[in-house]
Amino acid sequence: MSQIVVCAMYKFVTLEDFEAMRQPLLDTMIKNNVKGTLLLANEGINGTVAGTRESIDNLLAYLKADPRLVDIDYKESYHQEMPFYRSKVKLKKEIVTLGIDEIDPNKICGKYVEPKDWNDLISDPETVLIDTRNEYEIEIGTFKNAINPHTENFREFPQYVDENLDPKKHKKVAMFCTGGIRCEKSTALLKAKGFDEVYHLKGGILKYLEEVPKEKSMWQGECFVFDSRVAVNHDLEKGNYDQCFACRMPITEDDKKRPEYVKGISCHHCYDKVTEKQKARFAEREKQSQLAAEKGFSHVGDEAKKLAQLNKQKKQQAKEAARKKAQQ
């Protein structure tokens, strides 16, 4: 397979007709064989998709034809295989869920910082540097001296701010995330709470890794991504992590050697949290996945749907043939 372009994109912009946008956008993705998920809400668009160079260019051209999305923010990386199984466009209340209705980055947010200027900002001893991502993402990589809020999801971030940050004490706050969307919304939250100097990394970690040379980089480790690559290294190539299919946590080759790890069923992160009923279900899923692989099919996604439909048609044809034979 030729090299696949993985494109992460977002823009905070008022889309009053976001519901009507869904089907034409999905049709465009399917027509161009672009897979992945895009989220639409009144506050904007967000998602990561993948396809050939031509396919991604066609999708971006379609989006930019809308004057509201002409400057949509996007980052690209590359992979040898398609990292997604389906084409989806979902309607949401928020394109990234903070859970506070009055926070609107379209009205107020912090100051963008270009990747080339990021090192100077976070090297300033007056700067409080906060990683706005989840615990499991931070575990495999973050910026030097960044604070880990220890959140399980983005909805927990406002509580962290209320309990740990003070606009009178923390005069200069810089935040970052994978592609820029969570840290942008985080700056809107802090501005609403009275913080003055609030900054966020434009384009997120992915843009930083793309533009800042390794020898000057202050990034440590790998960057978690929400697709089958699991993580990317500083060259934006697939990293050294795999993923537990039970809990979706990143795992290393050493983690796979631990007694709690059973492929497709459990790992040391979730072994004590997964019920026997769930383990049985995961075991069956893994079995079906292996059978599909042996036949040269994917167990999930559009290919799996086609296989299921084909099997259904064969069964119906067999039943019809048996019925006709019985009537003879």
UniProtKB/Swiss-Prot annotation:
The chemistry this enzyme catalyses reads:
uridine(34) in tRNA + AH2 + O2 = 5-hydroxyuridine(34) in tRNA + A + H2O
| Residue stretches making up the Rhodanese domain | 123-217
Gene name per UniProt: trhO
Residue ranges under compositional bias (Basic and acidic residues)?
Answer: 317-328
Supply the alphabetized keyword list: Oxidoreductase, tRNA processing
| Molecular function per GO | oxidoreductase activity, acting on paired donors, with incorporation or reduction of molecular oxygen
Concerning InterPro entries, the annotation shows:
Rhodanese-like_dom (IPR001763), Rhodanese-like_dom_sf (IPR036873), TrhO (IPR020936), TRHO_N (IPR040503)
The Swiss-Prot or TrEMBL record describes its family as follows: Belongs to the TrhO family.
Where along the chain is the active site annotated? C177
Query: What taxonomic lineage is listed for the species of origin?
Result: Bacteria, Pseudomonadati, Pseudomonadota, Gammaproteobacteria, Thiotrichales
Q: What is its EC number?
A: 1.14.-.-
Q: Where is this region: Disordered?
A: 304-328
Recorded protein name is tRNA uridine(34) hydroxylase
Q: Does the keyword Glycoprotein apply?
A: no
Keyword Transcription assigned: no
* EC class name: oxidoreductase
